[in-house]
Amino acid sequence: MFDKNMTIAGYDDALADAMNAEAQRQEDHIELIASENYTSPRVMEAQGSVLTNKYAEGYPNKRYYGGCEHVDVVEQLAIDRAKELFGADYANVQPHSGSQANAPVYMALLEPGDTVLGMSLAHGGHLTHGSHVSFSGKMYNAVQYGLNPETGVIDYDEVERLAKEHKPKMIIAGFSAYSQVVDWQKFREIADAVGAYLMVDMAHVAGLVAAGEYPNPVQIADVTTTTTHKTLRGPRSGLILAKSNPEIEKKLNSAIFPGAQGGPLMHVIAAKAVAFKEAMEPEFKTYAKQVKVNAKAMADVFMARGFDVVSKGTENHLFLVSFIEQGLTGKLVDAALGEAHITINKNSVPNDPMSPFVTSGIRVGTAASTTRGFTEEDSKNLASWMCDVIDSCQQASESWDEKVVADVREKVKALCAARPVYK
């Protein structure tokens, strides 16, 4: 029998110390990793609930285990809200992550060895879009498209040419590091011309889509996948959506369970249900709009300071900065900004001469900073401070100006104190 007042603190001090230190880091550092965000206390409440105890293999009202009458309600709430939020006819809320949403789509629609056409990782795609180190590149014949070198936007002519040449069974639209608006309809036309399925991975922009700040692909694609964190601000998990197609829906359900997963995580599904409800609130639309405003403001500062912003700006929550001209590595810039308590991630950029472990660029995102209340002016100031730190970096000695970094760190400290994550 458990005492409800039991805590980790006082029982496992090493773990408690690490958790408390991370909580403090999140308050004291500015989070600009594009795939991260802060969830609400309600989402965390669901994830820490007794639902974690319940096994529920199968689907609502079609379980292999008994005692599922209450978790059936939870999962159906999540399904119904996901469909309403994104205008979908079908939703599967069981995937544990974005990658585990993508993999079952491959399983449902393809056979091993089939050809898929996806965005190159080096140009902004995701590992699961055909990278040779991923299941998507190992089990399937992956062909990759990229960006137009002159415009920095998706080269739709190349997509069409590769589709006609290789006749893929599935085309993947979506990205992990692309700052412009994807023309979903253009991808649909290309897919139809070669008889391919169209899968859209909207993991990064799902929150913007939900708020009407980015085009909705759900009724255009055959299948749409997403994570539920990032701009959607829910738990770290996955989701599959689709327009009406009973045959595909049946295949997708079977590919998730029993194909790719066993029992769903009911506490996480409850957290998704909460997040979907939060995303329907008027405040969320205001948030999503501000995310874009802040990203544009930051990208403009970087360009004004002479840095190469890939695609020459942003129309969503993120942008890439290339330091090829400056001869700096993303690894060095990442470390320098980290010392200033600004968290970003190094990222490969088009025509990057460095390895993925080093890179020549960084990815900057405003989903988390906007959640904690950063304004457009805050974002401009922050970008300027970042540029100061980057300007002080010396690649030859792999160092930076400690005084500049210390000055920025103090400014970051003051801004974080004024904009707490959890009050």
From Swiss-Prot:
Pfam families: SHMT. Coiled coil: none annotated. Pathway: One-carbon metabolism; tetrahydrofolate interconversion; Amino-acid biosynthesis; glycine biosynthesis; glycine from L-serine: step 1/1. It comes from the Bacteria. Keywords: Amino-acid biosynthesis, Cytoplasm, One-carbon metabolism, Pyridoxal phosphate, Transferase. Its EC number is 2.1.2.1. Disulfide bonds: none annotated. One of its GO terms (biological process) is glycine biosynthetic process from serine. (6S)-5,6,7,8-tetrahydrofolate binds at residues 121, 125-127, 355-357. The keyword Ribosomal protein does not apply. Its cofactor is pyridoxal 5'-phosphate. CDD domains: SHMT. Catalyzes the reversible interconversion of serine and glycine with tetrahydrofolate (THF) serving as the one-carbon carrier. This reaction serves as the major source of one-carbon groups required for the biosynthesis of purines, thymidylate, methionine, and other important biomolecules. Also exhibits THF-independent aldolase activity toward beta-hydroxyamino acids, producing glycine and aldehydes, via a retro-aldol mechanism. Homodimer. This is Serine hydroxymethyltransferase. It comes from Hydrogenovibrio crunogenus (strain DSM 25203 / XCL-2). The gene is glyA.
